[in-house]
């Protein structure tokens, strides 16, 4: 998606070009136009849909969303990256590695916990920062029209600063940072001559990284004296703690009672009057307005499906829906008042459940069918082509039937979906590797508000109080079934990933790895078993054992606040 902004007397109007899906945005303040899809790049090869998260839509920042593909090869070597030959090789597909010890024919299917959290941080920080950066609508973070405008040496977008030795935009800076910090094996699906510009920089990671090196980006091009965001944040935190301690000591000597950090957080949270003091009908209206647009698959698929075809379709849809799920979450009342750490943790803990309840709602009026998209409708028999998928389809269809029998209303659905998001991180355990939420008080207040909105929806039916209470219990009890299906889907998706049966896109991959670090018990045992028994085909999934078990929250703290960027089973 490539938004174009035009300033007029009435404000900012936007026109959007969607290359990979048909979306309808009902928005009273903006008008969107839709252009025709782009033509294929060449006969027999269709470029991967451009990842919309680097554009004006509030989405996650990451690498290319192009599907994984077997990358056998013995082609030309890059002068900037070392090439490793693989057992499976075909012309015009080159594997690039930043680590000479790597050996694989797949794009790396594992990102570190830090990378996953950084990508999600970039998405959650993207909306306001990007608008300020490119439109200059605000003084803070915007370009000064009186100063010289510089452009990114890699993609020719507006440069946000001097990064890694060259002028570059936030997207290319973050991409290069992830590439040199992670263990990424990029493969060009074409001829290593892809055009890298603002509109196509996401289409090929291998060529984008090659161009980064060509224009002079280097790992050593960092100002050592500045440290990083995490270093500066740690300095500020230490300074604040010292100041608070000093002031506390002075007040204690003077006999004045001081307020602790926890009380300060509660006081700050309680001060968010606009969110916490909303009436149930106001919360309900906001949730209805936050609903994401319908998504189309836009992929050519012919029946009967094979295992790889089916998994490719479903993971492609999941990746597209994740982009819109992030934008939806940011519109949930109170969500953006949370710290970035808490936003990331809630999303990483609930993403598959949120996608599943959306699938259930779309399928509620189609008995025996699962409506993954307007142009992707499947039944149970079609899921049998994938090992273990039929069981998940059965559970989904049974849950759809139960919601259908309850005659679920749209207002109730939006409340249940928001409850899934907020309740996913409401409780933490000492044995969990995930750090607890920073502001449990605020999260609990949000949960209470949304629960009140659900009660308000049910009360409008005019039924007796007993029937209203019973319906509320019936709806909330079904959320445990969705959690169970989510765990099953996570096990299945990771098993398919380890077998290289599925092309994992960057955003989906980040969410899957983050969920892995947060999981325990049966899910963790299944993953461990999968890693101990890798398939005979060389893959990069074994490298996941080198990742730290600390997930999104720890990575957020180590990286600090981020700048703009950004399965269904």
Curated annotation (Swiss-Prot):
Could you confirm whether the keyword Repeat appears in this record?
A: no
UniProt biased composition (Polar residues): 28-37, 523-532
Low complexity bias: start-end ranges:
538-549
What are the boundaries of the region Hinge?
218-278
Composition-biased stretches, type Basic and acidic residues, lie in: 237-247
List the InterPro entries hit by this protein, alphabetically.
Est_rcpt/est-rel_rcp, Estr_rcpt, Estr_rcpt_N, NHR-like_dom_sf, Nucl_hrmn_rcpt_lig-bd, Nuclear_hormone_rcpt_NR3, Nuclear_hrmn_rcpt, Znf_hrmn_rcpt
Zn finger limits (NR C4-type):
152-172, 188-212
Gene Ontology BP, a term: cellular response to estrogen stimulus
Q: Where is this region: Disordered?
A: 28-65, 223-271, 523-569
* One Pfam family it belongs to: Hormone_recep
Give positions of region: Modulating.
1-151
Q: Does the keyword Nucleotide-binding apply?
A: no
Q: Which GO terms describe its cellular component?
A: chromatin; cytoplasm; nucleus
CDD domains (alphabetical): NR_DBD_ER, NR_LBD_ER
What are the subcellular locations of this protein? Nucleus
Q: A single GO molecular function, which one? A: nuclear estrogen receptor activity
Q: Which residues bind DNA?
A: 152-217
The chain positions of domain NR LBD read 279-515
Which parts of the chain span the membrane according to its record?
Answer: none
- What is this protein for, i.e. what is its function? The steroid hormones and their receptors are involved in the regulation of eukaryotic gene expression and affect cellular proliferation and differentiation in target tissues.
Q: How does it assemble?
A: Binds DNA as a homodimer. Can form a heterodimer with ER-beta.
Family note:
Belongs to the nuclear hormone receptor family. NR3 subfamily.
Free-text note on domains in this protein's UniProt record = Composed of three domains: a modulating N-terminal domain, a DNA-binding domain and a C-terminal ligand-binding domain.
- Record protein name field: Estrogen receptor
Biological source species: Danio rerio (Zebrafish)
Q: Which gene encodes it?
A: esr1
